[in-house]
Regions:
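Short, polar/charged, Gly/Pro-enriched helix-capping and turn/loop motifs at alpha-helix termini
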Residues: 36, 176-177
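M16 family metallopeptidases and their MPP-like homologs
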Residues: 1-7, 82-116, 120-172, 178
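Proteolytic maturation boundary segments
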Residues: 1-94, 98-101
Length: 178
């Protein structure tokens, strides 16, 4: 085992202090976890009643369909086995670049940093990290010409919770106080 110690000035006994630190037993930090309670999907904001399917229409490629719900949400579903264990989700909302003034500068490049890491409801980024730890879930934000978008690549075991995470973000975005 080798170690390198780089300091701003030479002090007597540094080699011995480094050797003692490396030989000391490792102890888990008692203050590393900020909360004793595990974060679960039940900690996300609660929604109202689920919408019902109003129509299902085949579109485009075989297996692709457009689904309209009673709350106005539209879903384009393309179930296929082209990518094993992958579920791609793209949620479009709002008006994207069209929502901004053509004459005033807008820092739309900061949308991902400001909106995604800002939390959901009362959950901050740390709680969201705990919630998604060990799962294939994500939340990328982008601004298109005609819509804002949330994207993620997940897997069959996690896609329902991924959709719930997106819905919660749109329903009750939070602001992480950090």
């Amino acid at each position: 085992f080798r170690a390198m110690l780089i300091t701003g000035k030479v002090e007597a006994g540094q080699d011995q202090k480094l050797a003692a630190a490396l030989a000391a037993p490792v102890k888990a930090a008692t203050n590393a976890r900020l909360a004793d309670k595990a974060v679960t999907m039940d900690d996300l904001p609660k929604f109202g009643a689920s919408a019902t399917v109003v129509s299902r229409t085949p579109v485009g490629l075989q297996g692709m369909e457009s689904i309209t719900f009673s709350n106005g949400v539209k879903l384009t579903l393309f179930a296929n086995d082209a990518e094993t264990e992958k579920v791609r989700i793209n949620v479009r909302f709002g008006h994207g670049q069209q929502a901004f003034s053509p004459t005033k500068p807008v820092a739309s490049w900061a949308g991902d940093y400001a909106l995604v890491a800002s939390g959901i409801g009362k959950l901050g980024q740390r709680e969201l990290d705990d919630l998604t730890n060990g799962r294939r879930m994500g939340m990328q934000f982008s601004t298109d010409d005609d819509a804002f978008e949330l994207q993620a690549v997940t897997r069959p075991a996690d896609y329902k919770d991924q959709l719930r995470l997106f819905a919660a973000k749109l329903y009750q975005p939070g602001w992480d106080p950090a």
